[in-house]
Amino acid sequence: MKKVAILPNIQKDKGLAVTKRLVRYLEEKGCQPRLSEAVADLAELPQYAQTETELYQNSDLLISLGGDGTLLGIGRRTAKFEKPILGINLGTLGFLTAEDKNYAEAAIDKVLKGDFKLEKRMMLTCGIAKGDERTEGIIALNDICITRDLYKI
């Protein structure tokens, strides 16, 4: 896995410190770090910038930096590309993002050595129908919540 996309929650990765640290680490390991155009701009690392489609399509591994919500959002946006996601927790407790930011490099080392177990997750698709009218389905990784107030056809 040489092409690695780093996808941070910019509210949780203050000053993109963890992102920058992992970019340097991945380079040291002979990998090709990749960032979204927006993150590359904020981190002042334009050489790693890619469009979102390029980022998801051309990466071997996606690293989610944030919490479970960040990972769920990345899972939803990248589902059609079927790429593995490594969740690094930048908060206090994560169920899906089990790896702590202080051990991110060790987790990456395990992945690069092939010392990991890939957990395939079922994705959910939900759409709303009223008579002959139908919404386009949305994709979710964990759960979907539908309420009356948020949607009206």
Regions found by a protein language model. Name each.
Residues F95-I153:
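Catalytic core of DAGKc-family lipid kinases
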Residues G73, T78-F95:
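Gly/Ser-rich helix-loop-strand patches that form or flank binding pockets
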Residues Q47-S59:
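Short acidic low-complexity segments
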Residues G15, G69-G75:
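Short glycine/serine/threonine-rich phosphate/pyrophosphate-binding segments
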